[in-house]
Swiss-Prot record:
Protein name as annotated: 4-hydroxy-tetrahydrodipicolinate reductase
A single GO cellular-component term on record: cytoplasm
Sequence similarity: Belongs to the DapB family.
Reactions performed catalytically: (S)-2,3,4,5-tetrahydrodipicolinate + NAD(+) + H2O = (2S,4S)-4-hydroxy-2,3,4,5-tetrahydrodipicolinate + NADH + H(+); (S)-2,3,4,5-tetrahydrodipicolinate + NADP(+) + H2O = (2S,4S)-4-hydroxy-2,3,4,5-tetrahydrodipicolinate + NADPH + H(+)
Gene: dapB
Organism: Granulibacter bethesdensis (strain ATCC BAA-1260 / CGDNIH1)
Length: 261
């Protein structure tokens, strides 16, 4: 396509909190082909934006679909987008191993940008986290991740927190699943050497706060990102939808979009 303006961007779940922001950002930077509404939703479609009956028809009408819906829709959306040959910008968190497998399989057929967080600042934090973990040995520096979100958030720890944990684990040359300690309860004994701990807080209207702490006996180092407006995620997702045009099938991340790898 000759210009970004001609790129047709579809929005899955366009009447939700994120969906409405995505419509605004996509309309400013490209062409909104339309969107879907959550089944049973009483929220009206944004004015002037076509509402499609299902993900299949939206995929057929779009060059890229931005999807921040829910983990329960991932496998059905993967099938629809692969059939239509449409790029997928996926920001849904809380995916199961089966969901992640579906994402990997569709990436062999269409380009997929999958990220725990589309805010540029968070992705810089992820890159720094891996470098810091490589430089700060786990036998001296305990790694702890604390995140807080609004009271309605369903999954815990957040996708971004898990992404931070994976970055720390990669920097230390281990698998996160082997060293994760999430939500300690009661008397659990001393902290295990090399563990990566998680604590999740929920309350109020917090958009998203994440802190990675490296704690040694003689110093503490903290890396924090605070999101004050969901628009940061929406802008990043639309940036990814524009960037992915013309890319071959594959599984990409926001790091690729930002040219950080």
């Amino acid at each position: 396509m000759s210009t970004d303006r001609s790129i047709r961007i579809g929005i899955a779940g366009m009447a939700g909190r994120m969906g409405s922001l995505l419509v605004e950002e996509a309309a400013a930077q490209g062409t909104v082909s339309g969107g879907t509404l959550r089944p049973g939703s009483n929220s009206p479609a944004p004015v002037g934006i076509p509402a499609f009956a299902d993900i299949n028809t939206l995929a057929e009408a779009s060059d890229a679909v931005i999807d921040f819906t829910s983990a329960s829709t991932v496998q059905a959306h993967a099938r629809a987008l692969s059939k239509a040959g449409t790029a997928w910008i996926l920001g849904t968190s809380g995916l199961s191993p089966a969901d992640e497998k579906a994402v990997e399989e569709i990436a062999a057929l269409v380009p997929v940008v999958y990220a725990p967080n589309f805010a540029p600042g968070v992705n810089l934090v992820l890159a720094l986290a891996e470098k810091m973990a490589a430089a700060l040995p786990g036998n001296r520096y305990d790694a702890e991740i604390v995140e807080m979100h609004h009271r309605r958030k369903i999954d815990s720890p957040s996708g971004t927190a898990i992404g931070l944990g994976r970055a720390v684990a990669a920097g230390r040359g281990v698998m996160l699943e082997e060293v994760i300690e999430s939500g300690r309860h009661g008397h659990v004994g001393p902290r295990q050497p090399g563990a990566i701990g998680f604590a999740a807080l929920r309350g109020g209207q917090v958009v998203g706060e994440h802190t990675l702490l490296f704690a040694a006996d003689d110093e503490h180092i903290a890396l924090t990102h605070r999101a004050f407006d969901r628009r940061a995620f929406a802008r990043g997702a639309v940036q990814a939808a524009l960037w992915v045009q013309g890319k071959p099938p594959g599984l990409y991340s926001m790091m690729d979009v930002l040219g950080m790898r």
